[in-house]
Amino acid sequence: MNLILLGPPGAGKGTQAQRLERTRGMVQLSTGDMLRALVRSGSPLGQRADAIMKAGQLVPDEVMIEMISDRIEQPDCAKGFILDGFPRTVVQAEALDRMLAEKGLRLDHVIEMVVDDAALTERITGRFTCAKCGTGYHDTFKRPAQDGVCDVCGSTEFTRRADDNAETVGKRLEAYHRQTAPILPYYADRGVLKKVDGMADIAEVARQIEAIIAG
């Protein structure tokens, strides 16, 4: 089973990918993580990618495809993969399809985690964490029982991520919609695009994804 999970930062892609790794033995393939590992490997392809990135240029599609091709041939991908961060253009999507076809593989589903931008912004900007034990809270959805005191450890110190602000979240959402807009029709035309409610709770999103996979 080979999937692409689409969704903006904060939609819960990582949570669902980790669950699929745990329950189905699939492997999450983040192109960012793969590029860093490729550069560390010192292979000819890694050296080429490193030189390109150090020059401030985008890594060419053919390098990305070769990197993904090599990665999915590893034994841990035998039960399938979940691709994250690629493709972002129709040209990349077409190249990915060709590469998979040459291996006798295909994408079974492209799952879009659909979110409401305003609601997602509220979800992200309201997050805060106990500075001592790391327990997560939310201004609206999960406040401590006693204001200013952690339910778990009693600490009175809390932190917020610097980038969990409305301006930064808005820019992330804008970038996501701009990047994914071209490839949604491509996968819809091929009958593999499915949608789940990314604003539902984690268990419900998982149920919807499992229903898609079960077919």
From Swiss-Prot:
Q: In which pathway does it act?
A: Purine metabolism; AMP biosynthesis via salvage pathway; AMP from ADP: step 1/1
What organism is listed for this UniProt entry?
Rhodospirillum centenum (strain ATCC 51521 / SW)
Its subunit composition reads: Monomer.
Q: Which GO terms describe its biological process?
A: AMP salvage
What is the name of the protein in this document?
Adenylate kinase
Tell me, what does this protein do in biology?
Catalyzes the reversible transfer of the terminal phosphate group between ATP and AMP. Plays an important role in cellular energy homeostasis and in adenine nucleotide metabolism.
Q: Which Gene3D superfamilies does the UniProt entry name for this protein?
A: P-loop containing nucleotide triphosphate hydrolases (3.40.50.300)
Start and end residues of each stretch annotated as LID: 126-164
E.C. number: 2.7.4.3
Family the UniProt entry places it in: Belongs to the adenylate kinase family.
